[in-house]
């Protein structure tokens, strides 16, 4: 583009050097000198403008809140417009579909799945590990169904699932749960950075871990100060690596177990007999080991609740939600359960390299050990490199989700108002700075207490998932009860959870049992001879007293002692999308007719995908 500097005072463009070739040599030199000065001046001006734009990007974004009638032109005929409070979006949504698809598959695959389950395998054994993950996987699916129904019904609700409990349970319950969820994301950054330093020690344990922490810390902060586009591109690359690693690990583990690779020949179920399927000598001890693994499993499944957010991005959530829920089953079965089974068959629970085993090298991931202890040379280094990428990826996600969650809390009045600052590039700047400051905790990696800090942070994150998932399923139950009390038909719902209210009832009941079991495990920790240990209790149950402090603190400060919002007073139409039952039945019949006319291959794809 031509700037004003390319034109004279008359507005005409300056004569080019070629057009003045008939002038004298000296005149030509004078022109070239003048031209060079102009070029330098333009470059300097361009640099100044770039610096000025970068500085201006940190100024507060402009936005307003209005009441509008929202009608999505991309939705089907059966979706009516809804009247809602909307605000001009300050947080820029610059991610493309390829980013969203890959994130739905890979986001959350990090410390919980790749590293923390080493302690679960060591303390519980392979059978206890698999049982724990299977039990939690059922709750995960029930939570996804409940969140899906609510997200389709309330697609424009501010804060999404974080607002459900405030509306359908009580404000104090919602305040405590969402702040604990915020604490989870704040702890994820230092937790993942510590894990990254532990992962690198597989190669070199002589260099100060804080050096690695500093490198990753600066790298991540640098990404997020350049906005959401930089985050989207880096996450796309990270998640591609994670998915490829999981696929390769599954194939390699089967080959190793069958004797096709490594030095040990056919392994089969050898480690289920020696050292055994369960760790522990008594039945009560083995049961306690399973209880210990449950919280680790919740920590590993962390992030699955973000499924509800993806529903909001779809043009027709009524169609996309069943598909997304079906695909979540594959993620649960393949990425979580299948890999746990393969680890249980290929890694003995008494290996001294597992975290918590007390050996000299207690930092190796079971994914690495599944190959390295059988004599496979190069592959363990590749797996460890991808695990390193994975934990950095989750730390990257925490710097994306954490500041936006804090900003959302400030906008709802649940956090100090100054934290709602969003700059012109869509960065929640002050909230981002808070998260970055919290990440400094990671520099304890050079301390001998590194693994203890890791356990504390993981305990907060694990139990916070319990609270968040319980709030989603309990809100779903309260929503259904309010529909019944207010005489509303379920036919008005665009998507009904396939597990109904019974899935949510089971999920809430099971989570309550997990809270009780975790209390027992925390009070009388494993390997302590059944004796009580106060330090272990707070180390493993810290999230519960934090939640209670927020819950009763909100009650006292606001003088709001409501335990449950009255069912007949709940506003079911706030940000709700209304569906016409007759049009939904008509659309379902049309879809069935299309399915009958499909080829066999298309029918198979429709059934499975």
Curated annotation (Swiss-Prot):
Residues 17-44 have a biased composition (Polar residues). It comes from the Eukaryota. Belongs to the amino acid-polyamine-organocation (APC) superfamily. YAT (TC 2.A.3.10) family. The keyword Cell inner membrane does not apply. It is a multi-pass membrane protein. This is Leu/Val/Ile amino-acid permease. Present with 8660 molecules/cell in log phase SD medium.
